[in-house]
From Swiss-Prot:
Residues 97-235 form the Nudix hydrolase domain. GO terms for molecular function: ADP-ribose diphosphatase activity; metal ion binding; NAD binding; NAD+ diphosphatase activity; NADH pyrophosphatase activity. InterPro entries: NUDIX_hydrolase-like_dom_sf, Nudix_hydrolase6-like, NUDIX_hydrolase_CS, NUDIX_hydrolase_dom, Pre-Nudix. This is Nudix hydrolase 10. GO terms for cellular component: cytosol. Expressed in roots, stems and, at lower level, leaves. Its cofactor is Mg(2+); Mn(2+). Coiled coil: none annotated. The gene is NUDT10. The lineage of its organism: Eukaryota, Viridiplantae, Streptophyta, Embryophyta, Tracheophyta. Its EC number is 3.6.1.-, 3.6.1.13, 3.6.1.22. The keyword Cytoplasm does not apply.
Length: 277
């Protein structure tokens, strides 16, 4: 057979396809990143040839990264056994498990992370905004952005909603709820901050008004008595003002795996004596 002749597979002429471009992951699998346009017929043929090679090599999980420009390959990939794993604005990630043993591919992210910011000034007044159309005065809240620190998110949310600059002091408490956002769980961190400016410039999109409110007045809102979370937050703040409660302070660290900066939040007994304003 010459180099130009196609080989036979089960008596049928079989065209040779190059294996899809891939790199090994750290867990015995492969990551396929499609960058060159490909029609569905050639993709399926190349994918099947790739599977043959990966099985011989003992590969396990296959991660298929399809950018928006390769949306035509989603349906054929699913028909070949891939399932969705997660999506980002510019790509869809699909996965396939080769061995007959149970899959060990990790699930997609399970939680959304949010913050609430308690800002107390020297007059023991809290910073509140009135939620549009609700008549409820609330502390600044929001979602932590990808790659953003918890304390930085709290500072940002206060600035965005009220125009107030703040300094992070500690995490007072956090709670977990389930099926909160598209069936995902929710982690909510209540942060204590100290104001460094006082000129309120409210955000018009989400809140109707913003003001400094006496701690006693905020605690007397009907919603505070009806909602366990609000009630507990006020109770914790009250204990903090009495110096009988210590939250979690941040400590910069580097991880075991790399030298990237992270933060450990820990409870230090001496924090109970730290003034909040």
């Amino acid at each position: 057979m010459s180099d130009q002749e196609a080989p036979l597979r089960n008596g049928v002429e079989h065209k040779i396809f190059e294996v899809l471009p891939f790199v090994d992951d750290d867990y015995g699998g492969v990551i396929v990143e499609m960058k060159t346009p490909m029609d569905t017929k050639n993709f399926v043929a190349a994918l099947r040839d790739s599977f043959e090679q990966w099985r011989l090599q003992g590969k396990k999980g296959v991660w298929l990264n399809l950018p928006l420009s390769h949306v035509n390959l989603v349906e054929p990939a699913v028909k070949e056994g891939f399932r969705y794993h997660h999506a980002e604005p510019t790509y869809l990630m699909l996965v396939y498990w080769i061995p007959e043993a149970e899959s060990t591919i990790p699930l997609n992210a399970s939680h959304r992370v949010r913050v609430g910011a308690v800002v107390l000034n020297h007059n023991k007044e809290e910073k509140y905004g009135s939620l549009c159309g609700s008549g409820i005065w609330k502390i600044p809240t929001g979602v932590v952005d990808e790659g953003e620190e918890i304390f930085a998110a709290a500072i940002r949310e206060v600035k965005e909603e009220t125009g107030i600059d703040t300094e992070f002091l500690e995490i007072l408490a956090f709670c977990q709820t389930h099926e909160s956002f598209f069936a995902k769980s929710d982690l909510f961190f209540v942060c204590l901050l100290r104001p460094t400016s006082f000129d309120i410039q409210k955000q018009d999109l989400e809140i109707e008004a913003a003001q400094w409110m006496r701690f006693e007045d905020s605690a007397s809102q009907p919603i505070t008595h009806k909602n366990d979370l609000f009630k507990d937050i006020h109770h914790i703040c009250s204990m903090k003002m009495e110096k009988s409660y210590s939250g979690f302070s941040k400590k910069p660290i580097t991880t075991f795996f790399d030298d990237k900066l992270g933060y450990l939040y820990l409870n230090k007994q001496e924090d109970m004596e730290q003034p909040i304003s």
